[in-house]
């Protein structure tokens, strides 16, 4: 009897020691797939700097999310690019993008010199990041961020318009004169307005300087259309479109007219998904856009007045913000890191557009 008890305790101790020595659940990149998205990731590093968190999920996936006023941007690295050793015991974990030893998580995954990257779950309080490069092998225990919400696209959309990559690039060039100015403010000169009309199906991009219009074609496809208007920050719209332009696929425009009406831009590839959630800005005074809208309402169906974006704008109080736990940085970057590369703003990875302003109204039909 006594011998059996000793054997039982010994087996229990051996099992506990084996469990403690066992490798913790580990998330890693498939290196072959990772190398194919290295260049897009480097471009995203320049677009996702401030107020950015990284979430690891057991699907597996990696979600990088950045929040600012009236704009949330999300980059998802899909399961086809990842390997997870233990899906049962790996729990969803969120950390800051800023990692002092490496500068940022985005800086790690976009560095071509990295040969191995492991994310390990062995504590609810922190995430262990192990990095191997050509001349270094190191690890860091990064504190977890708790209670951070990942913004998700939910609900049926009354609007869906697909723009091909060349059209997205054209809109970015057209926005350039407004967004290049060094002044800042919420005056109408810094606003971009989007008008969607049903008959005939058209989408207009309007600023105080100019406007751009597209009708149904093989480059701009209207699936679900309703008369709608959006008042957006021109810089927010430019940044959202720049995110979608990186992976060079079509960009889908949708909306969720719920608690806070959002314009959702989505672009997808096999390994990456980009989403941008824009909420409307409130206009303090009647703008050229509003005056033009009143003229359009006189020509169109009066029943669509209730769908005016200005009526929905009053619902835009809830904003997704990342606040007190973020690490303050200078110009969106930290001081030192193992991968201390200088960014060249004129490199091939930069999103750089030139556009000559034309005061006349433009209409694009293919």
UniProtKB/Swiss-Prot annotation:
It comes from Human herpesvirus 6B (strain Z29). The lineage of its organism: Viruses, Duplodnaviria, Heunggongvirae, Peploviricota, Herviviricetes. This is DNA polymerase processivity factor. Keywords: DNA replication, DNA-binding, Phosphoprotein. Residues 1-25, 286-366 are annotated as: Disordered. GO terms for molecular function: DNA binding; DNA polymerase processivity factor activity. It comes from the Viruses. Belongs to the herpesviridae polymerase accessory protein family. It holds the Pfam family Herpes_PAP. Transmembrane segments: none annotated. Residues 313-322, 330-339 have a biased composition (Polar residues). The keyword Lipoprotein does not apply. InterPro entries: DNA_clamp_sf, Herpes_PAP. Accessory subunit of the DNA polymerase that acts to increase the processivity of polymerization. Residues 1-16 have a biased composition (Basic residues). Residues 286-308 have a biased composition (Basic and acidic residues). One of its GO terms (biological process) is DNA replication.
